[in-house]
A protein has these predicted regions:
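Active-site cavity-forming subdomains of large catalytic enzyme subunits
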Residues: 1-110, 114-115, 132-135
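Solvent-exposed alpha-helices and their adjacent loops that cap or buttress functional pockets
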Residues: 36-37, 48-49, 103-109, 164-167, ...
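Short glycine/serine/threonine-rich phosphate/pyrophosphate-binding segments
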Residues: 50-51, 121-128
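Terminal amphipathic helices with adjacent charged low-complexity linkers/tails
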Residues: 64-85, 127-171, 176-214
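Long hydrophobic segments that form regular secondary structure
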Residues: 98, 120-121
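Active-site loops and adjacent core secondary-structure elements that bind or stabilize anionic groups
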Residues: 107-113, 129, 202, 216-219, ...
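Single conserved hydrophobic/aromatic residue that forms the stacking wall/gate
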Residues: 236-245
Length: 245
């Protein structure tokens, strides 16, 4: 969903704006924001579960990277992407490329690392093991990534490089305007944090797909770089160290 505009102030607003006003006594303002915050259709525009997993599926190789960030109402979803997807399917059939050729332990690791880098939804750690299981990896910790490695990578190795809602300022349409998710995926690849040899649904490796897309460099405002990240790491703690008793 594209961000809305507050008709009274002209400021951009979204679903987070509505949440932040939930305790306000100004019922008129709450109603106005609720009606204007989410125009159109689609998923929540920030890096919530949907966009985290949409990015995950792109990086794991099951969707072309350039199709992830455009808004639901973007004309490309009707005028360009359908034919391109048919070409992908034709190529996969012709070359006998199956989902399990694409969704491997290495491509899932890539997608998890990107989820860290975008500060994505913690639900990724519910969905990723099930995706891995469907791909034939029954022991996620041993076959893909252990909890200890995840914590090490997110704390010491992989920074947050996107300033996105709900923790930041921008939405997926802003990421799209700066070149799409392929910008930060390439930056992570160039930094040596991803395996570029994994196969994708385009018939190319991840590195080959990124080379063809040739995304711009991170703009430093919406999309940051590994060298100059938005935040150095993900928060790792327990909000309830003594349990909720």
């Amino acid at each position: 969903i594209r961000p809305g505009t507050d008709s009274a102030t002209g400021e951009p607003i979204d679903i987070i704006t509505s949440y932040q006003l939930a305790g306000s006594d100004d019922e008129g303002m709450k109603r106005r924001i609720a009606l204007e915050a989410c125009p159109g259709f689609g998923s929540c525009g920030g890096m919530f579960t949907y966009n985290t997993m949409q990015t995950f599926i792109g990086v794991v190789g099951m969707q072309p990277l350039h199709m992830v960030s455009p808004a639901s109402q973007d004309d490309r979803r009707l005028t360009e992407f359908p034919d391109q997807l048919i070409d992908c399917l034709d190529n996969m059939v012709a070359k006998d490329i199956k989902p399990r050729d694409i969704v491997t332990n290495e491509s899932i690791r890539n997608a998890i690392i990107v989820a860290m880098a975008v500060g994505g939804s913690t639900n990724v750690m519910l969905h990723a093991p099930e995706i891995a299981r469907a791909a034939g990896y029954t022991n996620f910790s041993a076959d893909v990534m252990s909890a200890e490695e995840f914590n090490h990578l997110s704390t010491n190795v992989v920074p947050v490089i996107v300033d996105a809602r709900p923790f930041g300022r921008f939405s997926m349409v802003d990421i799209d305007a700066r070149g799409g998710i392929q910008v930060f995926v390439k930056d992570l690849l160039d930094a040596g944090l991803l395996n570029g040899d994994v196969l994708t649904c385009t018939g190319e490796t991840l590195a080959e797909q990124l080379a063809r897309l040739d995304p711009p460099a991170p703009d430093g405002d919406v999309i940051h770089s590994v060298a100059k990240p938005y935040k150095p790491c993900l928060l790792y703690t327990s909000p309830s160290p003594r349990d909720c008793k």
